[in-house]
UniProtKB/Swiss-Prot annotation:
Quaternary state and interactors: Probably interacts with PlsX.
Gene name, Swiss-Prot/TrEMBL: plsY
Family: Belongs to the PlsY family.
Catalytic activity, as annotated: an acyl phosphate + sn-glycerol 3-phosphate = a 1-acyl-sn-glycero-3-phosphate + phosphate
Membrane topology: Multi-pass membrane protein
Stored InterPro entries: G3P_acylTferase_PlsY
Enzyme class: transferase
Transmembrane segments: 3-23, 55-75, 79-99, 113-133, 155-175
Keyword presence, Kinase: no
Organism encoding this protein: Endomicrobium trichonymphae
Pathway noted in the entry: Lipid metabolism; phospholipid metabolism
Protein name (Swiss-Prot/TrEMBL): Glycerol-3-phosphate acyltransferase
Keywords recorded for this protein, A-Z: Cell inner membrane, Cell membrane, Lipid biosynthesis, Lipid metabolism, Membrane, Phospholipid biosynthesis, Phospholipid metabolism, Transferase, Transmembrane, Transmembrane helix
HAMAP family: PlsY
Record localization: Cell inner membrane
Length: 199
């Protein structure tokens, strides 16, 4: 039991590692929270620091979610324990102890978490994100559409009630973290991301 609890605590601390903040400081010598959208996330790093820095941040955030959940099964192979570990990773990223509990929006880490928990709903969500982004160039819109699909696909693909409830809770958290983006989308003032546009 002690090992299980320690693993969850370690997962929270790993999830709390502020990838965007660290990468931005290392590359642009700036506090990512003070530039662009002010969000400590991969998209803001991509836009304000550079493509390479953004990709590094994205990969780091995904791994923060995937690795702890994947290896949780070696400690306890019950799905409920994996969900607890996944929740710790998400909470760590969104409410990081290293930045006064003000972290990212949870999309990339959520992607890692869900790929470790359930592959098909994650692949469908990734495809939905891609389509929404390609047609709109809004990362926030793609993220919102993708995360909304998760509880729906997990339900229709026959996953347990426990899974559906967990994905629904994470969906609500991510949508809440995107509340300012939603406001800007409605006002048509949200920034688009053009990957191949030169700075």
């Amino acid at each position: 039991m002690l090992i299980k609890i320690l693993y969850i605590i370690i997962t929270y601390l790993c999830g709390s590692i502020p990838s965007a903040y660290i990468v931005a400081k290392a590359n642009g010598k700036v506090d990512i929270r003070t530039v662009g959208s002010g969000n400590s996330g991969a998209t803001n790093v991509f836009r304000e620091i550079g493509k390479c820095a953004g990709v590094i941040t994205l990969i780091a955030d995904i791994l923060k979610g995937f690795i702890p959940v994947y290896f949780a099964t070696f400690i306890d192979n019950s799905f409920s324990y994996s969900v607890a570990v996944a929740a710790a990773a998400m909470v760590g990223h969104v409410f990081t102890i290293f930045l006064k509990f003000k972290g990212g929006k949870g999309v990339a880490t959520g992607l890692g978490v869900f790929f470790a928990l359930m592959r098909w709903p994650s692949l469908i969500a990734l495809a939905i994100f891609g389509l929404a982004f390609v047609f709109s160039r809004y990362v926030s819109l793609g993220s919102i559409c993708a995360v909304i699909s998760l509880p729906l696909t997990s339900y229709f693909l026959g996953y347990s009630t426990e899974v559906v409830i967990f994905t629904f809770a994470i969906t609500l958290l991510i949508i809440y973290r995107h509340r300012t983006n939603i406001k800007r989308l409605i006002e048509r003032s949200e920034n688009k991301l053009r990957i191949f546009k030169k700075k």
